[in-house]
UniProtKB/Swiss-Prot annotation:
GO terms for biological process: hydrogen peroxide catabolic process; response to oxidative stress. This is Peroxidase. It catalyses: 2 a phenolic donor + H2O2 = 2 a phenolic radical donor + 2 H2O. Belongs to the peroxidase family. Classical plant (class III) peroxidase subfamily.
Amino acid sequence: EPGPSSDLTTLTTKFAAKGLTPSDLTVLSGGHTIGQSECQFFKTRIYNDTNIDTNFATSRQANCPFSAGGETNLAPLDSLTPNRFDNNYYKDLVSNRGLLHSDQVLFNGGSQDTLVRTYSTNNVKFFSDFAAAIVKMSKISPLTGIAGEIRKNCRVIN
């Protein structure tokens, strides 16, 4: 699976291996509009990346010290509306406020910039494309019969 420090080439290659397009990658990454990440996964970005809003980096550094400690401290993946499914994740990217390196590479002068900008201004298109990509992803090598299970709680095996 792709990691939080992956570059765009790595991400698109890993998604392509599952039959997903770069556009699928970009829209599915929008799932990060909800959720959090531990400091250990974004520390390098907030102290070393140059494509990051300075005020954003400083605010995240307050809860994620450069020296040892705080590795499990959490920060929201969507700084604007972390508990609402919307397109603000993309607004963060356009403002160089992506928490993970692997998020910000979607908007960094590369092939996905136009789509990120579109989603940042068009919530309806994001919702529609996200739904279609989720359905597409659900068809990737599904486990059937006794090999798979439908969980009532994703974290607990039935």
